Regions:
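Flexible glycine-rich surface loops and low-complexity tracts that mediate binding to linear polymers
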Residues: 98-136
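Bacterial signal peptide processing site
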Residues: 13-16
C-alpha cells in the first residue's frame, strides 16, 4: 500500500527532465477576443449587436501596418483603425479581409461603406474591451472608423 501511494505521489509531482515543474501551454485568448478580433480585424462580437444609425458614407484604401488595419483617407490625410461587421475574417495567408457575405478585399483596395467616426471609448461600448485595446494601440489621431454591423456594410468602391 505504501509503495502504491509513493508511486501516485511521484506521478502527481512529475517534473520536466531537468527537475523543473512541467509547463502546460495555454491560450491567453478570451472568448471576447476570439469574437472581436481576428488578426488585425476588429469586429462586432455578434451579428445581433446594434450599430445604430451609422449613415455616413466612408471611403478610403485598406492599409496594413504591423498588427493594425487602417482605412486611409487621402482627402483628409489621415488613417483610422476599422471596426468591421460581425463575422468579418482575416485571411492571413493572402493578407485579405473577407466580409461576412464572402467579398475579399486586398490591401490597397479602395473600399466604401456606411458607418461613422468614433472615439476609442465608443469602441469599448459597441464591441468590447479587446477591440478597444487594439484600436488604442493603432490610433494615429483620436478616432476610429466603425462600419454598420450588417454583412454588406462595406465593400470595394464601385
Amino acid at each position: 500500500m505504501a509503495v502504491a501511494l509513493l508511486l501516485v505521489a511521484t506521478a502527481c509531482g512529475s517534473a520536466g527532465s531537468n527537475g523543473a515543474p512541467k509547463v502546460i501551454p495555454t491560450s491567453s485568448t478570451t472568448a471576447e477576443e476570439a469574437r472581436a478580433i481576428d488578426g488585425p480585424v476588429m469586429r462586432y462580437q455578434d451579428s445581433s449587436s446594434t450599430s445604430g444609425a451609422l449613415a455616413t458614407l466612408l471611403d478610403g484604401v485598406l492599409q496594413l501596418d504591423g498588427s493594425c488595419l487602417y482605412l486611409v483617407q487621402e482627402s483628409r490625410d489621415q488613417r483610422f483603425p476599422i471596426v468591421w461587421p460581425a463575422d468579418t475574417r482575416w485571411d492571413a495567408q493572402n493578407q485579405t479581409v473577407v466580409t461576412p457575405d464572402g467579398v475579399v478585399m486586398s490591401m490597397g483596395t479602395a473600399v466604401e461603406g456606411r458607418g461613422g467616426y468614433f472615439f476609442v471609448s465608443d469602441v469599448n461600448l459597441l464591441v468590447g474591451a479587446a477591440a478597444s485595446n487594439l484600436a488604442r494601440q493603432c490610433l494615429d489621431n483620436d478616432q476610429t472608423v466603425i462600419f454598420q454591423n450588417v454583412p454588406t456594410a462595406v465593400g470595394p468602391k464601385t
